Curated annotation (Swiss-Prot):
PANTHER family: REGULATOR OF MICROTUBULE DYNAMICS PROTEIN (PTHR16056), REGULATOR OF MICROTUBULE DYNAMICS PROTEIN 2 (PTHR16056:SF15). Belongs to the RMDN family. InterPro entries: RMD1-3_a_helical_rpt (IPR049039), TPR-like_helical_dom_sf (IPR011990). This is Regulator of microtubule dynamics protein 2. The modification Phosphothreonine is found at T139, T154, T157. It comes from Mus musculus (Mouse). GO terms for cellular component: cytosol; Golgi apparatus; membrane; mitochondrion; mitotic spindle pole; spindle microtubule. Residues 120-151 are annotated as: Disordered. It is found in: Membrane; Cytoplasm; Cytoplasm, Cytoskeleton, Spindle; Cytoplasm, Cytoskeleton, Spindle pole. Interacts with microtubules. It comes from the Eukaryota. It is a single-pass membrane protein. The chain crosses the membrane at residues 9-28.
Length: 410
């Protein structure tokens, strides 16, 4: 199974059993400029403590405990405010870096009398294609498109500049396919990283005809996840993630015993959580964990599920003291997992599909390093280097494996 859909997923699904480990995601992610965190200030709990009257505060153990908790919350509030401000500043800097070159280009073209030719985003390209092939009325929008218009649809203009692969020239005639033929063709196209967009557009061309078919629905949800993966624009990522999640939910409603529906709904929940506030992140975390476990019960031989669970366990096992303290203070319990549990899932992935992904080998090696088994770690690092570098996830894993090998040789 292609493994590029795993990219960035775990960053959005660290909520854990009670949504707690999503706080860990927040703690790590605030230093990365790609994601904007609009968390509500964690001041409400502090205010509740502040409103308590403690007449015997200095003499009562209970009063001292409340004072201590209040001070803890005040520290967390200040920390949250500081990190949020840092993230907002980094997002503004990133925006300026992207905007200034385009502004310079526009000015040069204006004075030079040139005509600017921009690359077309995949979302605009797909819609333009449909406009030339199928005449649709203004009322024919699907429910997923309507949802995207509620706040997640992007401004589809030719001025958007993207840096990812574009599809080859598209035919102006849509070939009508039977459902089984369509699904086979879409699955086959998706096995090639460079053909994922074509697979997505093929499914979109037939969504009005097969929108009630479960096998079609979960594949279309998966395809929206692929487009999330390919997109570099934050707005487009939001658009694809939200529509995909809606489709995944519809698929589960129609077929609650279909493991693929639960799998890809969980994946899309993780993607959506990238752009949500703290409360919704926790909710997405609940959904991810719940549907991942259901999918494992229904698809016990699916390697992707164990890889995702391994990533989850590995991240939770590495929570720092302050992350655990924050989780306990805010939610009353601490998420728990071990490196051994993570390793078990990564090895299960390898057992089900040898050479599943470079990333799986990389995380297996990391587990062995932490367990004090450098020889096993080297073994899996070397196995990782035997695999081809195809996706961005592969490139990141390859770089990390090289660092690990250098460290193990010391």
């Amino acid at each position: 199974m292609p493994h590029s859909t795993n990219k960035e997923l775990i960053l959005g699904i660290m909520a854990g059993t009670a949504g707690i480990s999503l706080l860990a995601f927040w703690y790590h992610k605030v230093l990365k400029p790609r994601t904007t965190m609009n968390f509500p200030k964690l001041l409400s709990l502090g205010k509740k403590f502040g409103s308590l009257t403690l007449p015997e505060e200095s003499h009562s153990a209970q009063g001292a405990s409340v004072v201590f908790q209040r001070r803890q919350l005040q520290i967390l509030e200040k920390l949250n405010e500081l990190l949020t401000n840092m993230e907002e500043l980094k997002e503004e800097i990133r925006f300026l870096k992207e905007t200034i070159p385009k502004l310079e280009e526009c000015i040069q073209d204006e004075f030079g009398g040139k005509v600017t030719v921009h690359k077309i985003s995949p979302q605009h390209r797909a819609r333009k294609k449909k406009g030339t092939t199928v005449q649709r009325s203004a009322t024919s929008n699907s429910s997923e498109e309507a949802e995207s218009e509620g706040g997640y649809i992007t401004a589809n203009t030719d001025t958007e500049e993207q840096n990812f692969p574009f599809p080859k020239a598209l035919n102006t005639h849509i070939e009508e396919l039977k459902l089984d033929v369509l699904l086979q063709k879409a699955d086959h196209l998706r096995t090639n990283e460079s053909h994922k967009m074509e697979s997505f557009e093929l499914l979109c061309d037939h969504k009005e005809k097969f929108s009630e078919e479960t096998e079609f629905l979960w594949r279309l949800a998966r395809a929206y996840g692929d487009m999330y993966d390919l997109s570099t624009s934050t707005q487009e990522k939001k658009h694809y993630a939200n529509i995909g999640k809606t489709l995944g939910e519809r698929a589960i409603t129609r077929a609650p015993m279909n493991g693929h529906c639960h799998l890809w709904y969980a994946v899309l929940c993780g993607y959506v959580s990238e752009f949500e506030g703290l409360q919704n992140k926790i909710n997405c975390g609940h959904l991810f964990k719940k549907h991942l476990e259901i999918a494992i019960q229904l698809l016990p031989e699916e390697p992707l599920l164990y890889y995702l669970k391994g990533r989850y366990c590995y991240t939770v096992s590495r929570l720092s003291w302050i992350e655990k303290k924050m989780a306990a203070t805010l939610f009353g319990e601490i998420p728990y997992s071990t490196v051994h549990e993570a390793l078990h899932n990564f090895l299960k992935t390898e057992e089900l599909q040898p050479g599943y992904s470079m990333s799986n080998y990389m995380y297996t090696a990391k587990c062995y390093v932490e367990l004090g088994e450098p020889q096993e770690a080297c073994k899996f690092c070397n196995l990782a280097l035997l695999l081809p570098v195809v996706t961005k996830e592969d490139k990141d894993a390859h770089k990390e494996v090289k660092k690990m090998i250098s460290s193990l040789k010391r």
